[in-house]
Amino acid sequence: PSEFTLHEGVLKHGKMNIDLVYNRLTDFSLSEPASATLREAYLQNAIVLTPNPQAHALFADKRNLVLLSDPIRLQALGVPKATQDILLAAIPHTEIVLPENAERLWQKRRELFFKPFAGFGGRAAYRGDKLTKRVWQEIIAGGYIAQALVIPGSRVISDLEPAQVLKFDLRNYTYDDK
């Protein structure tokens, strides 16, 4: 992104005009200095940015999972019972890692998975039973959620001995309001 320029409302990379950017950076909020030109182009509606900062904040920030997995808060917000049932069945219990819950979470770590608020693709995500004390110190420094561990499913894909088994996971996505 630091190689982009914005000239008269047109984002450019060298001489090439850019009108769509598929954002695979980890700076989804475009707050880092290297993203300044990209941020300005987005704010001027000079480009389509996917995901854009608002979409990322609404749909990808893992802190939202804390609310979406809390039955008391969902009820207090007036979320319909049928919607609550779907959310609570699909989203493992999630909480923010804080200094005041760090000791309890460390004791329960084998039942948890730790993920950064805004990470993606498994970057800096840790299964609790594999944590070292060094990594735990990074996690409790801030910016992580703890989520109930869901063991990945598996399928036998061969009749050979030993059978070949592959793990899989299911993910929830949203696109175009669906």
Please place each PLM-identified region on the residue numbering.
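Domain-scale recognition of functional cores that engage charged ligands
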Residues: 1-178
